[in-house]
């Protein structure tokens, strides 16, 4: 229970930057002192909860069109969480694996690329470049790169295997299956879809009042 709470707490903290970095040492010391005589999980959570952002701010952060630009490492964590949540136990993949050069095998891919050929993409896509809905995971970043949407969707490897965005290998790409092109509306709609999946497990229970526990 505590570990699950701490995972949510740090996720929310990184999304909203609340509490601020200069508050963390004091906060953690205060929380630790409450546990010196006896372990009290509820009291520990209460202290952390009082400093945490409201759910509205967490939602606002996920809606940001600069989400990746603001914290690319956090976005990678969110995408991996989303992908793993869509898989059965038999289909789990180690998305944290590294290659023999010490680099991550799976990386964040911009569906609308960071350096697009402008004649191959809708002009309004650039407004959602770093939004959640324009981001996915791939183990073939160099194969996708700055290609058009159609080519990124259907690209194959040297052995003829499907590795594109519509290959079905990445579950969070299911939204793309019936898409022939990609625009800002698609980015917004996919952002909403992914956010809803994420928040099922990452929203805090605002109905819980810990004040009596702390005082």
Label every model-predicted segment.
Residues 1-215:
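Flexible coil/loop and intrinsically disordered segments
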